[in-house]
Amino acid sequence: MADPSDPMKPDGEVNPIDTDYQIGQDNIVVKVGPFGLDIHNRVFLISGLSVIVFVLLTIVFHSQAEPLFASMRGWLTSNLDWFFISAANIFVLLCLVLIVSPLGKVRLGGTEATPDFGYLGWFSMLFAAGMGIGLMFYGVSEPLSHFSSAYGGTSFEDGVRTDWAPLAGAGGDAAAAERLGMAATIYHWALHPWAIYAVLALGLALFSFNKGLPLTMRSVFYPLLGERVWGWPGHVIDILAVFATLFGLATSLGLGASQASAGLNYLFGLPQDTAMQVLLVIGITLIALISVLAGLEAGVKRLSEINMTLAALLMLFVIIVGPTVAILTGFVSNLAAYLQHLPALANPIGREDANFAQGWTAFYWAWWISWSPFVGMFIARVSRGRSVREFLVSVLLIPSLACVLWMSVFGGTAIRQVVDHGYEAAASADLPLQLFSMLDFMPWAQVTSFIAIILVVVFFITSSDSGSLVIDTIAAGGKVNAPTPQRVFWCTFEGLVAIALILGGGLVALQAMAVSTGFPFTIVLLVACIAVVKGLMSEPRPGKV
């Protein structure tokens, strides 16, 4: 067993990195009465000041910011869609190669390390990492959108394709459109995003548990940069990680605010406008701040567990009350459709469905990549003692299957309402309202819609609270117990960035910043793949897994 006094200490054989660097040696430590700061002098100052300037400029010049964000998103996705799609394919292929190679025998934490959590608890945490505001927002809207686009078929104007259907569409064929729509949805929520998370989580766990380096992004690059990783190259990597995580979280928080606003409008007739979204962000950020100030980590964890239970109960309700047989058979047929269409959906070149590849896929991959430091660090923390093979198989499959089930239940039900009953309220509603419109066709709609709002709000709180911890760890040079005021700063600015983006263009601005920060961090992750392989090759491997 590992030394309980040092949970990061390796167990058994490892090949640690010999470095004189001490965690926090470059930090500025300030103590003022009961308060204090312990910040990395360059990472915190540069990223913190940049975020402050961004928020101020975007709020003050929000009318000028809106067209800027729209053009920025359009340029990045239309010119770099091939890059994002290719990068995501590389992450999947790397995971598959590591699973079947001898490197899969390397154990995180040392050859004798034992898991900190049993399978059930570990799988539950992986499942929890896959749930969030995104599934609540897109669980109904994305399958419906792809189904409708595919059913409408292709259209051209001056020889240029103008429709949003994935691949070649399925003009007029409802069954084929449903299969293609669900396959396209699952493509965005299954193996590819979880491969992105898995690669970074593996790197963080390997270089922390096995190599004895700080739990921060720069540590992953030690095999390539050596001691320079503690200088400016490492500073840049950590600063990019802070930006990516902050804007990735802000995108999710903005989506959550728009959906909560739509739900409150549906239930209570409250205004569904920008002001309401801003008020929701302020209110929920204040709740997250209270949890940070009061040290309610245990309470937030408990709240997250309750939320997961509520999500499971809501899903079970839809399965039982909705088209049960169609949902259960659809889960299998949707997986089959996903595997059938996967090669074409993942093809980065010669695509005719430019709107789908650029407007959906490129955005998603950039968004997932910007989320990767947040989710990757969480997965790394709970995966000590697992072999690389066990780790990758579980991280790829368990959350992917959970996401497929969620999309099959909510998206499949919405599609069946259209096809079997001609109920098109959900399909014609605005994106944030589509979940509530789908629930409105079922019994106890007021109750289930209220539960859905609670789910969105609590996912918002837990994401903000946990995200501030991850950002603070990076900006504190790898220290995991930095002073509370630092987390207050990051938690506050997660909300302020979301507000700035809502004022600066809403969904378009949120997506623009996710893509903008995701692009440079994609380059960081691609280089990290090389570092991870080099790190694994230097590790001792037991004869048996």
Which role fits each region the language model picked out?
Residues 2-165, 175-177, 293, 316, ...:
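N-terminal alpha-helical transmembrane segments of multi-pass membrane transport
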Residues 15, 35-45, 49-59, 92-95, ...:
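Helix-loop-helix module between adjacent transmembrane segments
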Residues 27-33, 67-73, 101-119, 144-170, ...:
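Flexible loop linkers connecting adjacent transmembrane helices
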Residues 31-36, 61-76, 96-116, 180-188, ...:
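Membrane-water interface regions at transmembrane-helix termini and the short interhelical loops
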Residues 39-43, 105-124, 325, 329, ...:
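C-terminal membrane-solvent junction of multi-pass transporters and transport-like membrane proteins
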Residues 47-55, 284, 398-402, 486-502, ...:
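Hydrophobic membrane-spanning alpha-helices of multi-pass integral membrane proteins
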Residues 50, 83-100, 311-322, 402-412, ...:
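Hydrophobic alpha-helical segments of multi-pass membrane transport proteins
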Residues 229, 233-389, 393, 398-450, ...:
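Membrane-embedded translocation segments of transport machinery
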